[in-house]
Regions:
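Residue-level signature of outer-membrane beta-barrel architecture
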Residues: 1, 51-53, 64, 109-111, ...
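Repeated loop/turn-to-beta-strand initiation elements of outer-membrane beta-barrel proteins
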Residues: 3, 56-60, 114-119, 157-164, ...
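Transmembrane beta-strands of outer-membrane beta-barrel pores
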Residues: 9-15, 64-69, 121-125, 168-174, ...
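Surface-exposed coil loops of outer-membrane beta-barrel proteins
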Residues: 18-48, 55-149, 244
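Membrane-embedded beta-strand positions in outer-membrane beta-barrel channels/transporters
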Residues: 46-48, 104, 147-149, 186-188, ...
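Detector for outer-membrane/organellar transmembrane beta-barrel domains
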Residues: 153-245, 259
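Outer-membrane beta-barrel "beta-signal"
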Residues: 289-301
Length: 301
């Protein structure tokens, strides 16, 4: 049983008129492309205490959190190493996600050798560039994001690779932020095959209001590790129905396709070219489809 302080400070800035995070909406697409690649400047991502219990089979975190670290997680969700489109990440774009550095508490553990449970409560509305305001807001505003997740895995050490789960979430209404309350559900089934080389997945979500991007979403795809796990190919497709409470009624359904290949050039440096094909961008009736080309570099020292 061990404890640790976890923290992360970042500086995020654009080099052009539009940051990658805004590429989608800039072209009328309801969705986010590389959400971390924004223009927020210096900001706090997390600052919390992590306590592991029961020989590492249970964990509690408390402080300023990034809830995507433990809500609706699967192995290809990270925007740093996996898919770039948010439709293939937490909640399949059909979930309200608090901003980073939100004050709260989360915990999870193995109920049996195969069944796990994860829950959290956090401040729903926060600004990571003014992170310490979230502590007062948690106690004064009473506007919360809550989640509970029940899942099945082949073992505690396989929880990120072999994972079937159902996540339920709720967000409170905020008069100050001008956002509606709501609730929803997300599910995931992913399985690592062929000595962990191949991982197919199916994921989806439903939102009843809550200010999410999509109201209904379904994603399928796979990751394939090559050269003994050094490199990785990712292929995925998504169908999404924009949230009419967020964007209005009568919008077209969107279809998203993405392919990436991550080259691990050295132990520290990875380069990932990426192609996305966006069909029927809901907020741009003049365009039937859009192409997005990306190149991501990651240096881990």
């Amino acid at each position: 049983n061990t404890g640790a302080a976890v923290w992360k400070i970042e500086h995020r800035h654009r080099y052009t008129d539009q940051s990658p995070q805004g590429f989608g909406f800039d072209q009328g697409y309801v969705g986010l492309i590389e959400p971390p690649f924004s223009n927020e400047g210096t900001r706090l991502t997390n600052l919390y205490w992590r306590q592991r219990l029961n020989d590492g089979k249970a964990t509690i975190v408390a402080g300023m959190l990034d809830v995507t670290d433990f809500v609706d997680v699967y192995a290809l969700a990270s925007p740093w190493t996996g898919f770039m489109n948010f439709a293939f990440s937490t909640g399949s774009a059909a979930m309200f996600i608090p901003n980073d550095a939100t004050f709260g508490i989360g915990g999870g553990g193995m109920l049996t050798d195969r069944i796990f449970l994860i829950g959290s409560i956090a401040n729903a509305y926060t600004d990571p560039t003014e992170p310490f305001d979230t502590v007062d807001d948690f106690f004064d505003e009473n506007e919360y994001f809550t989640s509970i997740e029940l899942g099945l895995t082949r073992g505690h050490d396989r929880i990120y690779l072999d994972n079937a789960h159902l996540t339920l979430w709720h967000v409170d209404k905020s008069n100050r932020a001008g956002t509606p309350g709501g609730w929803g559900a997300a599910f995931n089934y992913s399985r690592a095959l062929r000595d962990n080389a191949l991982m197919p997945f199916i994921r989806g979500g439903y939102a009843n209001d809550g200010g999410s991007l999509l109201e209904k979403s379904l994603s399928i795809g796979f990751g394939y590790n090559t050269f003994g796990g050094r490199d990785q190919l990712g292929v995925a497709a998504n169908w999404g129905e924009p949230n009419e409470d967020s964007f209005g009624s009568g919008l077209d359904d969107q279809y998203t396709f993405e392919v990436f290949y991550r080259f691990q050039l050295t132990e520290q440096l990875a380069i990932t070219p990426d192609i996305q094909y966006l069909v029927d961008p809901a907020l741009n009736p003049d365009e039937d489809n859009l192409w997005v080309f990306g190149l991501r570099a990651r240096l881990a020292l």
